[in-house]
Amino acid sequence: MLAIFSGRDILMCMNKRNYQKELDREIESLEEGQVPSLFLHSCCAPCSSYVLEYLSRYFSITVFYYNPNIYPAAEYHARVEEQKRFIKELPAEHPISFLEGDYIPQEFYDCARGMEHLPEGGERCFACYRLRLEKAVREAKKRGYDYFATTLSISPLKNAEKLNEIGEELAASYGVRWLPNDFKKRNGYKRSTELSREYGLYRQDYCGCIYSWKERHPETL
């Protein structure tokens, strides 16, 4: 049976933004010899692997590790150490530094309140995107960075359109440029798995929060 598409469906497909091409244009617009600063929120070392390999050719990067959603605390600390190890071991054309945000799980629980029952990938996740990106842009603004972004879009399970929508909204509010991205494009996710094997990175089997953990491990309930 042939699928039937409405004019609205076709128009939406035609108007769908290609964030990778937008990133290409942003990089191409940089003046020769210019190395702008990027405040990059990272969710974990594996997701940051390809992103850092790619963007460190063009930017001086600070990896901002702010993830109060991660459960339990032992998992959080394991991911922090893996992130720091990867940054130390990765050869990069331009400097990559590390900054850890406060780990206060209650900040995540507050933003997720009333959405605990929702499935992964919906409004609760969008609220979590916003929580982490707003913390990132505030720090980027305070520290005088040229751009901010997140590694989250590399995951096939993360909504790149929503991430860019939130990023652009925050950029307009705080006056720090958002670096458009969909890092899973051009085999970015595939490259991240290759780098994870190459560096022996710990790859967790759930996003990080207690709700995703319960979905992945129902036998523990």
Predicted regions and their residues:
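Nucleotide-activated chemistry modules centered on ATP-dependent adenylation/adenylyltransferase
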Residues: 2, 6-50, 58-221
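Aromatic pocket-lining residues of Rossmann-like dinucleotide-binding sites
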Residues: 55
